[in-house]
């Protein structure tokens, strides 16, 4: 399937499984009359594959060591991308950032790294399923930067176009999206 055909097919899957209209309160606290819940798309076999392939294509030239983001939205995507990247011969390892460190066990804030391995000096992309203001992704950025990693960009599946570009710009971070909310609102 061509890249444009994959993008069109994924758009339809997101529209059917993950986009809705109706009043909701977003993670940012804002009210909205439409919403995206990408988990049904990210956990669907075809949706997960298309998301991972399109994300890999968007990132393959960025010379990345790791992909990760804040739980829960980044976990399915990071895992699927790690798998696709290995299949394509350019492995990008995955991790996720806990909203708060576990209070038991190893008490980790960042999960998925082998024992003794760190993100220090590594090139990292932060991914997110849906981005509104960028606040949630910035929490992940801050946690990852504290490890000494270089966060090279933030990539979201859907940009709600409500301030994230400004948030990441102020932090000196490039920001990319696979889709814009306006594409779904016009469909």
Curated annotation (Swiss-Prot):
Keywords: Glycosyltransferase, Magnesium, Pyrimidine biosynthesis, Transferase. Pathway: Pyrimidine metabolism; UMP biosynthesis via de novo pathway; UMP from orotate: step 1/2. It comes from the Bacteria. CDD domains: PRTases_typeI. InterPro entries: OPRT, Or_phspho_trans_dom, PRibTrfase_dom, PRTase-like. The keyword Coiled coil does not apply. Coiled coil: none annotated. Its EC number is 2.4.2.10. It catalyses: orotidine 5'-phosphate + diphosphate = orotate + 5-phospho-alpha-D-ribose 1-diphosphate. One of its GO terms (biological process) is pyrimidine nucleobase biosynthetic process. Orotate binds at residues 132, 160. Its cofactor is Mg(2+). It is an enzyme of class 2 (transferase). 5-phospho-alpha-D-ribose 1-diphosphate binds at residues 98-99, 102, 104, 128-136. One of its GO terms (molecular function) is magnesium ion binding. Belongs to the purine/pyrimidine phosphoribosyltransferase family. PyrE subfamily. PANTHER family: OROTATE PHOSPHORIBOSYLTRANSFERASE, URIDINE 5'-MONOPHOSPHATE SYNTHASE. Catalyzes the transfer of a ribosyl phosphate group from 5-phosphoribose 1-diphosphate to orotate, leading to the formation of orotidine monophosphate (OMP). Homodimer. This is Orotate phosphoribosyltransferase. It comes from Bradyrhizobium diazoefficiens (strain JCM 10833 / BCRC 13528 / IAM 13628 / NBRC 14792 / USDA 110). The gene is pyrE.
